[in-house]
From Swiss-Prot:
Pfam families: 2OG-FeII_Oxy (PF03171), DIOX_N (PF14226). One of its GO terms (biological process) is anthocyanin-containing compound biosynthetic process. It comes from Malus domestica. It catalyses: a (2R,3S,4S)-leucoanthocyanidin + 2-oxoglutarate + O2 = a 4-H-anthocyanidin with a 3-hydroxy group + succinate + CO2 + 2 H2O. Belongs to the iron/ascorbate-dependent oxidoreductase family. Coiled coil: none annotated. This is Leucoanthocyanidin dioxygenase. Residues 212-311 form the Fe2OG dioxygenase domain.
Length: 357
C-alpha cells in the first residue's frame, strides 16, 4: 500500500499540481541565488571560460605524440577545472540512448507505481526512489526526485530494487555500468601518469577492479514555476573518485570556476566527467574537485544520470600519496577513511547551516 504522504512529498506531484509559486522550503537563501537566470540563454553564451572537451579517441592512437598530447589535455582539464566533456569515449550512442529511454520510461510511470521502489532513509535504506538524498540542517529542499542504486560490480548490486519497468531497464543500465567501469580504468591510467605514477596506481588506491563501487543516481528535475528561486541540486563537490554524467540535452549543470558560475554546454554524445574529492585528496589538491550545482527551468524536464565511482567505505585510508607531498607542498588533507570523509563533510555542512545568514 502506497501512502498518500509519500506521493504528496514528491516534487513531481508538486510541479504537476498547477502551483504558480513554490513552497518556502524550496526557496534558496539569497547568497545561493547568484547568477541564476534563464538557463537556456546562459547555455548559449560563448563568452568567458568554457568547460573543456577531451577527445578520447586520441588516447588509442598509434602515434605516441598524439597519445601524449591527449594525456596532457586531460591532465590540464583535471588540474584547471576538475570537469570536462568526454567525446569518443567508447560508449555507443545507441547504448546511451537506451539508458536515457529506460530511465525516462521509469520516471514517466504513475507516481503510485514508482512508490513501490521508494527508499527509506530513516532506516538506512538509501537505494531506490526518493526525493532527498541528504538532510541539511537548514531544512531546505531541492527541486528534484531521484532513483539511486548500486550498478557495479555485479556482486554488489541488488537487482530486486531495480525498476522492472521498462523491460529493458536492467539490461541497458547493467551494460552501461560495465562499459563505464572500463572507461574509469582508461581515465585513471591517464591521471596516474599525470602525477608521475605507474599507470595502475590510482585505480589500485581507489579499490581496484574488485572494490571500486559504481552508484547511479538518476536525477529528475520537473518544470519549476519559479526557477530563479530554486535549485535542482545545491552547490557541492562530489565525494567520489570520478563521476560520469549523462543527460537528456536540457542544460542545467553549472560549475564554480574562477569565482563565477559557468553554465556547461550540452555537447551531443558526450559524457560529462567530474574529478571528485577522493582524487583531489590522493593528488594532494593537484586535481580539482569542482563545486557545481543543478539548475531548473520552467519549460523542460531535465534528467541526468550521474554515476559515482567510489572507493570502499572502510578498507582504504584516503590521504595524499607520498609522491604528491614535498617540503614545498605539504599534505593538504588529513588521513581519513572514505566513510569518515563523508561524515566530515556532512558535519561541516550542518555547522555552516547553523551560522547566521
Amino acid at each position: 500500500m502506497v501512502s498518500s504522504d509519500s506521493v504528496n512529498s514528491r516534487v513531481e506531484t508538486l510541479a504537476g499540481s498547477g502551483i504558480s509559486t513554490i513552497p518556502k522550503e524550496y526557496i534558496r537563501p539569497k547568497d545561493e541565488l547568484v547568477n541564476i537566470g534563464d538557463i537556456f540563454e546562459q547555455e548559449k553564451n560563448n563568452e568567458g571560460p568554457q568547460v573543456p572537451t577531451i577527445d578520447l579517441k586520441e588516447i588509442e592512437s598509434d602515434n605516441e605524440k598524439v597519445r601524449a598530447k591527449c594525456r596532457e589535455k586531460l591532465k590540464k582539464a583535471a588540474v584547471d577545472w576538475g570537469v570536462m566533456h568526454l567525446v569518443n569515449h567508447g560508449i555507443s550512442d545507441e547504448l546511451m540512448d537506451k539508458v536515457r529511454k529506460a530511465g525516462k520510461a521509469f520516471f514517466d510511470l504513475p507516481i503510485e507505481q514508482k512508490e513501490k521502489y521508494a527508499n527509506d532513509q530513516a532506516s538506512g535504506k538509501i537505494q531506490g526512489y526518493g526525493s532527498k538524498l541528504a538532510n541539511n540542517a537548514s531544512g531546505q529542499l531541492e527541486w528534484e526526485d531521484y532513483f539511486f542504486h548500486c550498478v557495479y560490480p555485479e556482486d554488489k548490486r541488488d537487482l530486486s530494487i531495480w525498476p522492472q519497468t521498462p523491460a529493458d531497464y536492467i539490461e541497458a543500465t547493467a551494460e552501461y555500468a560495465k562499459q563505464l567501469r572500463e572507461l574509469a580504468t582508461k581515465v585513471l591510467k591517464v591521471l596516474s601518469l599525470g602525477l608521475g605514477l605507474d599507470e595502475g596506481r590510482l585505480e589500485k588506491e581507489v579499490g581496484g577492479l574488485e572494490e571500486l563501487l559504481l552508484q547511479m543516481k538518476i536525477n529528475y528535475y520537473p518544470k519549476c514555476p519559479q526557477p530563479e528561486l530554486a535549485l535542482g541540486v545545491e552547490a557541492h563537490t562530489d565525494v567520489s573518485a570520478l563521476t560520469f554524467i549523462l543527460h537528456n540535452m536540457v542544460p542545467g549543470l553549472q560549475l564554480f570556476y574562477e569565482g563565477k558560475w559557468v553554465t556547461a554546454k550540452c555537447v551531443p554524445n558526450s559524457i560529462v566527467m567530474h574529478i571528485g574529492d577522493t582524487l583531489e585528496i590522493l593528488s594532494n589538491g593537484k586535481y580539482k574537485s569542482i563545486l557545481h550545482r543543478g539548475m531548473v527551468n520552467k519549460e523542460k524536464v531535465r534528467i541526468s544520470w550521474a554515476v559515482f565511482c567510489e572507493p570502499p567505505k572502510e578498507k582504504i585510508i584516503l590521504k595524499p600519496l607520498p609522491e604528491t607531498v614535498s617540503e614545498d607542498e605539504p599534505a593538504m588533507f588529513p588521513p581519513r577513511t572514505f566513510a569518515e570523509h563523508i561524515q566530515h563533510k556532512l558535519f561541516r555542512k550542518s555547522q555552516e547551516a547553523l551560522l547566521p545568514k
